[in-house]
Amino acid sequence: MTKRILMLEDGNYFIGDAIGSEKETIGEVVFNTGMTGYQETITDPSYYGQIITFTYPLVGNYGVNRDDFESINPAVKGVVVREAAEFPSNWRNQITLDEFLKEKGIPGIAGIDTRKLTKLIRKEGTLKGILAAETANKEELLHHLRSVRLPVDQVHEVSSAKAFASPGDGKRVVLVDYGVKSSILRELNKRNCYVTVVPYNTTAEEILAMHPDGVMLSNGPGDPKDVPEALEMIRGIQGKLPLFGICLGHQLFALANGADTFKLKFGHRGANHPVKELATGRVDFTAQNHGYAVEKDSLIGTDLKVTHIELNDETVEGLAHKEYPAYTVQYHPEANPGPSDVNYLFDEFMEMMNGKEEGELHA
C-alpha cells in the first residue's frame, strides 16, 4: 500500500498508509472523540478547512450510505484514522470509507498512532498539518506548511449562495446559513415548518420583509469575528422576532450583544460532552463541534445570561437574552452524530414562536 506522511507545523510527523484521494492537502489538525458518526462528521460544513483525527481506533466499519450526509460536498481537508475498515458490514452500507474519500477528493492516512497524535494536540493545541506522499522531502514540507496561512472567511465558502425554500404548512422560519447541517433543516421540517434558508450576509431588513415567525442562526466553521455582517443583522431582528442560535450562531449572538469570544486550545469535538442547565441542574450529554467559545467574563454588563455550562471546563454552552425571546446553545441539539437528549430545544423554539402570535414580544 502507498505510504503517506502527516507533517505538523511543530516538526512532528507520522507515516502511515494512504487512503482516499492522492492529492496533497493542508489544514488545521483537530480530533473528534465520537465512536460512531464518521459520515456525518466528515460531511459537517463546520469542519471546513480541517484535517479530522478520529480517536476511536476503527473507522468505517459500517460503511457509507446515501442517507446520513450533512452536506452534499464535504468541506474537510483530510481524515486521519488508526484503522480504516476494508470490509464494512451494515444493511445500509453502499461504499467503503476509502471509496467515499476517493469519490469526494479527500485525502487520508491510516495506520498511525492516533492516541499519540491526540495527546500532542491536547498538549500543544490545534496545529497546522500537511498530508503528502511519504517520499516528499520533509524539510521542504515543513517549510511550505509553516509559510501557509489558513483561510479566513470560511463561512463564505460553505453558506448557500442564494435563498431557497423547504415548504411546510406550519410556522415560517428563516434559517440563516453559516454552514448549516442538513439535520437542522430536517428537525424544522419534522415540525412542519416552512423554512427559508438564506445566505450568511442577508440583512435584517431582508429577513423582516419575509414576515417569518422566527429566525434560526445555524452552525458554521471558523472564527465568529470573521462574520461581522451577522452582528448588525442580529441586532436588527432581536426583539422583533423569536431567535434561536446553534454553535456559531450562539457565538455570533454573543458578539452582537457586546460579549467576546476566544479560541479554545483544542476545541470540543465529539458526542459525549456533559452540559448542565443552570436553572434546573439537569445534565445532558451533547454533541459538540466548536473551536471557539464565548468569554464568560465578557458577559458582565450585557443583556445576556448564561443558561448552560460544560461540566468538563465550564465553557459557556447556553445563553438567553434577559428581555427578548432569544436563546442560543453552543452544542448541537439536532445531534447527528450524537445523543438526542437536547432535541427538545427545537420544541421550545416552536413554543417561542407561538408566543409571538400571542403578543409576548417586547418590541
Curated annotation (Swiss-Prot):
<dbReference type="GO" id="GO:0004088">
    <property type="term" value="F:carbamoyl-phosphate synthase (glutamine-hydrolyzing) activity"/>
</dbReference>
<keyword id="KW-0028">Amino-acid biosynthesis</keyword>
<feature type="binding site">
    <location>
        <position position="251"/>
    </location>
    <ligand>
        <name>L-glutamine</name>
    </ligand>
</feature>
<comment type="subunit">
    <text>Composed of two chains; the small (or glutamine) chain promotes the hydrolysis of glutamine to ammonia, which is used by the large (or ammonia) chain to synthesize carbamoyl phosphate. Tetramer of heterodimers (alpha,beta)4.</text>
</comment>
<feature type="active site" description="Nucleophile">
    <location>
        <position position="247"/>
    </location>
</feature>
<comment type="pathway">
    <text>Amino-acid biosynthesis; L-arginine biosynthesis; carbamoyl phosphate from bicarbonate: step 1/1.</text>
</comment>
<dbReference type="InterPro" id="IPR006274">
    <property type="entry name" value="CarbamoylP_synth_ssu"/>
</dbReference>
<dbReference type="InterPro" id="IPR029062">
    <property type="entry name" value="Class_I_gatase-like"/>
</dbReference>
<comment type="function">
    <text>Small subunit of the glutamine-dependent carbamoyl phosphate synthetase (CPSase). CPSase catalyzes the formation of carbamoyl phosphate from the ammonia moiety of glutamine, carbonate, and phosphate donated by ATP, constituting the first step of 2 biosynthetic pathways, one leading to arginine and/or urea and the other to pyrimidine nucleotides. The small subunit (glutamine amidotransferase) binds and cleaves glutamine to supply the large subunit with the substrate ammonia.</text>
</comment>
<keyword id="KW-0067">ATP-binding</keyword>
<feature type="binding site">
    <location>
        <position position="248"/>
    </location>
    <ligand>
        <name>L-glutamine</name>
    </ligand>
</feature>
<dbReference type="Pfam" id="PF00988">
    <property type="entry name" value="CPSase_sm_chain"/>
</dbReference>
<keyword id="KW-0055">Arginine biosynthesis</keyword>
<feature type="binding site">
    <location>
        <position position="222"/>
    </location>
    <ligand>
        <name>L-glutamine</name>
    </ligand>
</feature>
<feature type="domain" description="Glutamine amidotransferase type-1">
    <location>
        <begin position="172"/>
        <end position="359"/>
    </location>
</feature>
<comment type="similarity">
    <text>Belongs to the CarA family.</text>
</comment>
<dbReference type="GO" id="GO:0044205">
    <property type="term" value="P:'de novo' UMP biosynthetic process"/>
</dbReference>
<feature type="binding site">
    <location>
        <position position="289"/>
    </location>
    <ligand>
        <name>L-glutamine</name>
    </ligand>
</feature>
<dbReference type="GO" id="GO:0006541">
    <property type="term" value="P:glutamine metabolic process"/>
</dbReference>
<dbReference type="InterPro" id="IPR050472">
    <property type="entry name" value="Anth_synth/Amidotransfase"/>
</dbReference>
<dbReference type="GO" id="GO:0005524">
    <property type="term" value="F:ATP binding"/>
</dbReference>
<feature type="binding site">
    <location>
        <position position="291"/>
    </location>
    <ligand>
        <name>L-glutamine</name>
    </ligand>
</feature>
<feature type="active site">
    <location>
        <position position="334"/>
    </location>
</feature>
<protein>
    <recommendedName>
        <fullName>Carbamoyl phosphate synthase small chain</fullName>
        <ecNumber>6.3.5.5</ecNumber>
    </recommendedName>
</protein>
<keyword id="KW-0436">Ligase</keyword>
<comment type="pathway">
    <text>Pyrimidine metabolism; UMP biosynthesis via de novo pathway; (S)-dihydroorotate from bicarbonate: step 1/3.</text>
</comment>
<keyword id="KW-0665">Pyrimidine biosynthesis</keyword>
<feature type="binding site">
    <location>
        <position position="220"/>
    </location>
    <ligand>
        <name>L-glutamine</name>
    </ligand>
</feature>
<dbReference type="InterPro" id="IPR002474">
    <property type="entry name" value="CarbamoylP_synth_ssu_N"/>
</dbReference>
<keyword id="KW-0315">Glutamine amidotransferase</keyword>
<feature type="active site">
    <location>
        <position position="332"/>
    </location>
</feature>
<dbReference type="Pfam" id="PF00117">
    <property type="entry name" value="GATase"/>
</dbReference>
<keyword id="KW-0547">Nucleotide-binding</keyword>
<dbReference type="InterPro" id="IPR036480">
    <property type="entry name" value="CarbP_synth_ssu_N_sf"/>
</dbReference>
<feature type="region of interest" description="CPSase">
    <location>
        <begin position="1"/>
        <end position="172"/>
    </location>
</feature>
<dbReference type="InterPro" id="IPR035686">
    <property type="entry name" value="CPSase_GATase1"/>
</dbReference>
<dbReference type="InterPro" id="IPR017926">
    <property type="entry name" value="GATASE"/>
</dbReference>
<dbReference type="GO" id="GO:0006207">
    <property type="term" value="P:'de novo' pyrimidine nucleobase biosynthetic process"/>
</dbReference>
<dbReference type="GO" id="GO:0006526">
    <property type="term" value="P:L-arginine biosynthetic process"/>
</dbReference>
<dbReference type="GO" id="GO:0004359">
    <property type="term" value="F:glutaminase activity"/>
</dbReference>
<feature type="binding site">
    <location>
        <position position="46"/>
    </location>
    <ligand>
        <name>L-glutamine</name>
    </ligand>
</feature>
<feature type="binding site">
    <location>
        <position position="292"/>
    </location>
    <ligand>
        <name>L-glutamine</name>
    </ligand>
</feature>
